[in-house]
Amino acid sequence: MKLKVLPPTLRKNNRYLALDIKVKSVISKDDLVNIVWHGCIRFFVENGTGNFSLWVMKFYELEKTDEYNHYQAILRCQREYVDEVRASLALIYKHNRKDISVSTIGLSGTIKACQKFIEK
């Protein structure tokens, strides 16, 4: 028996956050996933963070300098929890004893529209 596809009215509404990341060490997409999850778990505990439906959709490496490495990413979360995710991302300041800065540069309803905020 084939499973039926959920109609749009019953699907979860997602929002996509464009993130700007500056860190003093080299990170990968998997490291960013860990950074985001640990930041949200520290601020909202596991019970609240499980509802966020966090997912790193895209990860871009922009530049490497002597002082820092610059990355940008697109993060998916549920519409109802956008403010909570942004708050927990703002509180991230260390990763592996290195300074890190994560800021939100844009918010959108689709990935295509969110890519307008990303520098390539």
Task: Describe each region flagged by the PLM.
Residues M1-I27, V33:
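N-terminal, charge-rich interaction modules
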Residues C40, L91-I100:
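A common structural junction motif
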Residues I21-K64, S103-G106, C114, I118:
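Surface-exposed, low-hydrophobicity interaction/linker segments
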Residues R15, Y71-A73, I100:
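Core residues of folded domains in eukaryotic genome-function proteins
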Residues K64-I74:
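The conserved glycine-aromatic submotif of the RRM
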Residues G48-T49, V85-A87:
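Intrinsically disordered, low-complexity regions enriched in proline, serine, glycine
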Residues R76-D83:
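Helix N-cap motif at beta-to-alpha junctions
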